[in-house]
């Protein structure tokens, strides 16, 4: 009977709460801060760059804040001979060409047909990149809304996961289903990691499954509406006992001069490692910066107990002012800057793919 009672209490705790009014969302804006908001209030938060988790479908996650496991990340790079030839394959022109297509959709809103179509396009590109690699796969991750997340998996010798992620959705802050090319936010990050994946799988050891760890590349749905897709993925990984040893987030990579290395809601040891990768494999200048609670998808990994890092296009406050509007277009972006971010991703992924963690 005690077991049945415990199960009943557990089911009650997991039940979806009833909003005060239809259409409201439960958002978390701090470790102990949750509140119900209307659709307008939620989109005002987006326009005002207030980070939040939408936990309407995962209310139990409000009390989840697992401390990320500590790993001894490498203190030195070990694979320059293998990585540097891959960096030469990074093409700013190719990133630009892909981004022109990706930002041509009217919007990539998470609950619109155009958001579904843009996700399908990403999946097709990723499949073309990894389709001939034995054991590799690209799959859709379905959610409770229209747009799926996309996941590419390149198996290694272990099931430990090194993940790279970027959100694929876009939003018009004044009219969520209005025009939102989202070239920088976050077409730039999405195409940056696609370019990095293309370079990485040209390496015979990566393609041959000889890496110590498994590589995953994620394109998340619904980031703009409260980190929805990344929450689903990392909470599921946590529940399934999967071991994500590192996650690198790429959200906006095309604007500004000095990259921002985000130091809040991220893992300090992984961030230190990431700076070493920047110094070794890119020509980028960077400075420390903070982006606040739940500002992007690395926060979902961090909350689920996985070490994460985030390198942003600029120090917060010096980033692209045109995001969340019809003016977030490719003409304002620097493809060479995106290529430097892609080099970061290649170095990060390769070094950790072969690291003993």
From Swiss-Prot:
Q: Could you tell me what this protein is called?
A: Probable leucine aminopeptidase TRV_02148.1
Its keywords, alphabetically, are: Aminopeptidase, Disulfide bond, Glycoprotein, Hydrolase, Metal-binding, Protease, Secreted, Signal, Virulence, Zinc
The UniProt similarity line reads: Belongs to the peptidase M28 family. M28E subfamily.
Its cofactor is:
Zn(2+)
Q: Name one GO biological process term.
A: proteolysis
GO cellular component, alphabetical, reads: extracellular region
Superkingdom to which the source organism belongs: Eukaryota
Instruction: Give the EC number(s) under which this enzyme is classified.
Output: 3.4.11.-
Q: Which residues are glycosylated?
A: 76, 186, 269
Q: Where in the cell is it found?
A: Secreted
Q: Can the keyword Zinc be found in this entry's annotation? A: yes
| Organism of derivation | Trichophyton verrucosum (strain HKI 0517)
Q: In which residues is Zn(2+) 1 bound?
A: 167, 185, 251
Subunit structure, briefly?
Answer: Monomer.
Instruction: Read off the Pfam families from this record.
Output: Peptidase_M28
From the UniProt annotation, give the residues forming the signal peptide: 1-15
Record-level Gene Ontology MF annotations:
aminopeptidase activity; metal ion binding; metalloexopeptidase activity
Which top EC class is named for this enzyme in its record? hydrolase
Per the UniProt entry, the disulfide pairs are 291-295
Kindly give the CDD domains that the UniProt entry links to this protein: M28_AAP
């Amino acid at each position: 009977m005690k077991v049945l009672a415990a199960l009943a209490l557990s089911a009650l705790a997991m039940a979806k709460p009833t909003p005060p009014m239809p259409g409201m969302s439960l958002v978390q804006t701090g470790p102990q801060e949750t509140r119900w908001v209307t659709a307008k209030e939620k989109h005002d938060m987006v326009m005002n760059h207030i980070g939040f988790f939408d936990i309407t479908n995962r209310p139990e996650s409000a009390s989840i804040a697992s401390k990320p496991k500590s790993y001894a990340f490498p203190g030195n790079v070990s694979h320059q001979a293998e990585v540097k030839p891959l960096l030469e394959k990074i093409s700013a022109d190719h990133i630009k060409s892909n981004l022109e297509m990706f930002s041509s959709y009217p919007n990539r809103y998470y609950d619109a047909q155009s958001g579904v179509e843009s996700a399908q396009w990403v999946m097709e590109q990723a499949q073309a990149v990894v389709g001939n690699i034995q054991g590799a796969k690209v799959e859709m991750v379905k959610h409770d809304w229209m747009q799926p997340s996309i996941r590419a998996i390149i198996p290694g010798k272990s099931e430990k996961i090194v993940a790279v992620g970027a959100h694929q959705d876009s939003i018009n802050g004044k009219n969520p289903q209005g025009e939102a090319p989202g070239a920088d936010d976050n077409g730039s990050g999405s195409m940056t990691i696609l370019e990095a994946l293309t370079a990485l799988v040209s390496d015979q050891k990566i393609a041959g499954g000889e890496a110590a760890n498994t590589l995953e590349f994620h394109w998340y749905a619904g980031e703009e509406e409260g980190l929805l897709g990344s929450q689903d993925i990392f909470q599921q990984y946590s529940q399934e006992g999967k071991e994500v040893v590192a996650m690198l987030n790429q959200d906006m990579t095309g604007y500004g001069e000095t990259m921002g290395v985000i130091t809040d809601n991220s893992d300090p040891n992984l961030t230190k490692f990431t700076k070493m990768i920047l110094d070794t494999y890119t020509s980028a200048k960077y400075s420390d910066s903070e982006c606040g609670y739940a500002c992007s998808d690395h926060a979902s990994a961090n909350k689920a107990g996985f070490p994460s890092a985030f390198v942003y296009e600029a120090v917060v406050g010096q980033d692209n002012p045109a995001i969340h509007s019809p003016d977030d277009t490719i003409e304002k972006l620097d493809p060479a800057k995106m290529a430097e971010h892609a080099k970061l991703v290649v170095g990060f992924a390769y070094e950790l793919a072969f690291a003993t963690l």
